[in-house]
């Protein structure tokens, strides 16, 4: 009976430890991510997402501020929390997206949640104007893909909860090709 009790206690402790690890939160500022809306945070945010994934998952927390970024590849088990007053601002420069279909994107992801009372602003009008200017100069193809705010392909367990979509560059707020995406309470304050 004693060995069985020890195994049961060990199993419970292991489960609690795994749950605690999955719920670890990391402030964006810890990774040098700037909230002034002027600095391009693409590299810093990507490094933060990658590092959190390497640690076994957790939540990257954005507090009050404006966080300018290009395209960010999400990782399984890494969540994004946008606190009230936090605004992720998509770059108004098509080159910042490196051909990707969204500000936040992923392929083959599992268990990712983007949530909070913050905003993801696609800067759609400015991005479309930049693309038109680059096309006029012959720098960008006429059929260049315009990024949505979010893009998922072949993903499972994606949850989008309570944040605001603003100024999308495309009619689709998010793209979900062959993906399981649950949208719960998100809304847009921008007419599509």
Give residue spans per PLM region.
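Positively charged n-region of N-terminal signal peptides that target proteins for export
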Residues: 1-7
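Small/flexible residues
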Residues: 7-8, 68
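Cleavable N-terminal signal peptides
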Residues: 9-10, 20
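Short, linear, compositionally biased motifs with a strong N-terminal bias
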Residues: 13-14
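Extracellular/periplasmic carbohydrate-active domains that bind, remodel
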Residues: 21-192
